[in-house]
């Protein structure tokens, strides 16, 4: 089922339990959320960095990303989820589950947030509580050529040395202490 056209986002004002949340269509990509939601709502969810991955799959799987060390995973900020299910007669029903629900709806809310593969219906919309606003984020990127048998290229031995140095750097420079400026470091090797 293609949800790529479900890309709207807005401040929810109609549903009392979700008032003040930002409603995000499940087809919204990580890139569009970061690019559009931050100027619109003053925050971006702490989700992934793959620009083409959409909220429907990423959020349902937990939503780990570059800002997760600071703000948790995206599922930590989901207050509600709208989905379409089929009843026993094959009739489509739109269901809204929220963090305040109990019983079957509460269990469904839990399962849709990374607890069971997200295959309980077609998620059409997420409702996110705002994360802390970040005025600046530092990003550093290093690229290495992969051509072997050249002085600047990475052969197997150079790659092994790079990975070992990379791991040693993060092991000594990353801090779990909340007041340490290095507690916000995030490493990604692609």
Positions of predicted regions on the chain:
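C-terminal cap/substrate-recognition region of VAO/PCMH-type FAD-linked oxidoreductases
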Residues: 94-190
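FAD-binding glycine-rich core of flavoenzymes that anchor FAD
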Residues: 1-108, 168
């Amino acid at each position: 089922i293609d949800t790529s056209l479900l890309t709207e986002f807005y401040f929810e004002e109609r549903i009392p339990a979700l008032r003040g949340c930002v409603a995000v269509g499940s087809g919204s990509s990580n890139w569009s959320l970061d690019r559009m939601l931050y100027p619109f709502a003053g925050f971006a969810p702490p989700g992934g960095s793959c620009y083409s991955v959409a909220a429907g799959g990423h959020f349902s799987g937990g939503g780990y990303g570059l800002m997760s060390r600071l703000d948790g995973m995206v599922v930590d900020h989901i207050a509600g989820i709208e989905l379409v299910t089929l009843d026993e007669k094959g009739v489509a029903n739109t269901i809204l589950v929220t963090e305040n629900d109990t019983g079957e709806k509460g269990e469904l809310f839990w399962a849709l947030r990374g607890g069971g593969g997200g295959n309980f219906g077609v998620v059409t919309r997420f409702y996110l509580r705002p994360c802390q606003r970040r005025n600046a984020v530092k990003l550093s990127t290093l690229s290495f050529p992969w051509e072997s048998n050249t002085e600047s290229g990475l052969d197997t031995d150079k790659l092994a040395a790079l990975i070992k140095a990379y791991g040693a750097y993060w092991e000594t420079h990353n801090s779990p202490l909340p007041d340490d400026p290095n507690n916000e470091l995030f490493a990604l090797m692609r």
